[in-house]
Amino acid sequence: MSKSDLNLLVENIKFEHLNVFYDFVVSVLNALSISDFELSVILCDNAYIQELNNKFRNKNEPTDVLSFNYNEHNELNEDLVDGINYKIQGDLVISFEYLKFSAQEFNVEIYEELQRVTIHGILHLMGYKHETNDFQKEGMLILQENILKENKRVF
């Protein structure tokens, strides 16, 4: 039996596009054949994510996204990606404040960057990994950009 549970939370920031963001997350889950999920996405400020980054990764600095996988035995077999229904259980924590900086750095709109890091976090929850940030060679990052292209929303 499939369970679909998606929660969006906002901590210490203003975010007025929860409905559009919710629809985007659902479209990404569908694109990845994820029909069984328990997922919370927390949009927050740098202080909130820095505290979590320090506590769980011993890095006392903000970051764009943290993925907390509660289904740790997820091991992705990339040869079997097509046609498989994945189950994910976890939390994504995304610093909207940090995204303002990274969107400027990459010369993209902040909501595009939000969508990109959301996909990135979901892929990590599925078990995807990457060694570099090479968007031309890393399979995970290529998939991320393809999903973004197909599911991008206007906020």
Swiss-Prot record:
| Record-listed E.C. numbers | 3.1.-.-
Instruction: Answer yes or no on keyword Metal-binding.
Output: yes
Q: How is the cofactor bound?
A: Binds 1 zinc ion.
Q: What does the UniProt keyword field contain? A: Cytoplasm, Endonuclease, Hydrolase, Metal-binding, Nuclease, Ribosome biogenesis, rRNA processing, Zinc
The Gene Ontology biological process terms listed for this entry are: rRNA processing
Protein family according to the UniProt entry: Belongs to the endoribonuclease YbeY family.
In Swiss-Prot or TrEMBL terms, this protein is called Endoribonuclease YbeY
Which species is listed as the source?
Borreliella burgdorferi (strain ATCC 35210 / DSM 4680 / CIP 102532 / B31)
